[in-house]
Regions:
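Extracellular Ig-like/FN3 beta-sandwich strand-entry sites
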Residues: 33, 105-111
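Short acidic/polar inter-strand loop motif in beta-rich domains
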Residues: 115-125
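Short coil-to-beta strand junction motifs in C2/discoidin
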Residues: 49-57
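Short, hydrophobic beta-strand segments
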Residues: 98-106
Length: 131
């Protein structure tokens, strides 16, 4: 049996359409809200069809020296063109891109996870500096 952590795939988001791209300032001010943007398919668009799509993105923050991460957001994408008339008939599609805000007083690591219904779990991370 594989450990759950081994199910996550990683790759440079500039070359892989499944890897979540995380955009944050290099440094943020202690205790002030800042923006985090996570996109799947930023450089290479990911298909968004009934048959092949991104189902969700989760974002976590692990403060430096912390033992456990904090979940700071979970976002589900539920419109992939399906309707009562069949697959890819509704013309309604959600884009796997989210923007959220949070604040911290400690530097740490932001983690983003995404799930493709065909290619499984994907992960990325970025360091966050605090001044």
């Amino acid at each position: 049996m594989k450990p759950f952590a081994d199910l996550f795939q990683t790759a440079d988001w500039k070359n892989e359409k499944h890897s979540p791209a995380i955009e944050v300032p290099e440094r943020v001010k202690k205790g002030e809200d800042f923006q985090v943007k996570v996109t799947v398919g930023k450089e290479i668009p990911h298909p968004n069809t009934t048959e092949h799509h991104i189902s969700w993105i989760e974002v976590y923050f692990l403060p430096q020296g912390g033992r456990f991460p904090f979940q700071i957001g979970r976002f589900e994408f539920t419109a992939h063109g399906e309707s009562t008339e069949g697959p890819n008939t509704s013309t309604v599609y959600t884009k796997p891109e989210v923007v959220l805000f949070f604040r911290t007083e400690k530097p740490g690591t932001i983690y983003a996870f995404s799930y493709c219904n065909i290619h499984g779990l994907w992960a990325n991370q970025i360091e966050l500096g605090v001044e």
